[in-house]
Amino acid sequence: MSALFSPIKLRGLELPNRIMVAPMCQYSSVNGEANDWHFTHINTLALSGAAMFCIEATHVEAIGRITPGCLGLYDDATEAALKPILVSVRKHSKTAVAIQLAHAGRKASSHKPWDGGQQIPVSQGGWQAEGPSAVPHKEGEAPPLALDAPGLARVRDAFVNAARRAERLGIDAIELHSAHGYLLHQFLSPISNKRTDQYGGSLQNRMRYPLEVFDAVRAAFPAEKPVGIKVSATDWVEGGWDLAQTIEYAKELKKRGVDWIDASSGGVSPLQKIPLGPGYQVPFAQAIKEATGVTTMAVGLITEAKQAEDIVVSGKADMVALARAMLYDPRWGWHAAAELGGQVEAPPQYWRSQPSTQKALFGTTTFGTR
C-alpha cells in the first residue's frame, strides 16, 4: 500500500491521503474580494486528488495585504465573496478546505510580482505598512510603522475575527502564516525585530507575539477543527532566524496544541542565499518532527510521485504540500495514485477518464447503458 495514499487524522479531520495543495497567492482580488479567477482556480485544484486544499494567504486586514490584488477575509464583503466558491467546492468535491490567514507586515503595499514586486509608495497609491520595528525590508524603502500596544491588539483581534469568519464559511482547517518574511515571521527574526520591550530581544520575547496570535486563533476556532502553522525554518542569512530557534518555536506551539507545522524557509531578507534543489526543505520538516513529534508537512520543489512517497515512507515528514507542481499538473494527485497504486476520489463526470488498466483508481465506479 502506498504511504502517500494512506489516511491521516488532524485533530477531528480525517484525510484519505497525505497530500495538500499548498496556499499560493494569486494576486487577483479587487478590494480583497475573491472573484471568477478564484472560483476557477480553487474549484480546479479541489479536484486534484489531494486530500486538502489550502486557500492562498488570506489577509486579516486591508493594510496587511502584500499587494492590492491580495485576498482578504476582514469584512462582510470579503467573506461573502468566498461563500459561493466554497458552496461549489462542497457540491463537487470531498477535498477538505483549509485557509491560510496572514498579515504582510512590512512587506505590505507591494506591486504584484509580474509588475516588479517593489514597494508602492503612499504617493503612488500605496499605504503605510506596519511591522514589529521601523526597519524596512529593503534598503531605500520607506520603513514600516512599529506596532504599539493598541496596534498589536488590533492585529491579533483581526486574526481572531478572520478565524470566526472562516468558521462561518465552513472552512475545515486554518494555517497561520508565520513564514516568508511576513508579519509573524518578522517578530521571530532578529533581522526584522529590533524591539526593546517584551516582544523583542531574547528568543522567548520574539516568539511571544506569534504565540499570542496562535493562542487567540486556536481559542476562536472550533476545538474539533485543526489549526496548523507555516514556518520559515531559516532566514538563510547569518545572524537571522535558524533551525535551532525554529525547533524551540515548534516546542512552544506543541504545548499550545498545534496540529501541523508546514516547514518552509526564507523571505525575511533580500540578502538570503537559498540552495535550491529537489526537496531542499525536507530536512527542516524532518528535524522538527524528530525534535517535537508534531505532525509536519514537507514543502518546496516536491514534484514527483516517487519523491513524495519516499518522504512519507522514510518518516521525514507526515505529509507533503505541493504548489507549482499542482499548477503545472492540476491532476497531480490522480497521476501519483496511478503510479503508486493508490486511490483517489473523483466526480462521476470524470470516471471514464481512468486508465483501462487501473479500473480501481477512482474506487467503485459503475455505469448503466441502454
Where do the language-model regions lie?
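Flavin-dependent oxidoreductase catalytic cores
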Residues: M1-R370
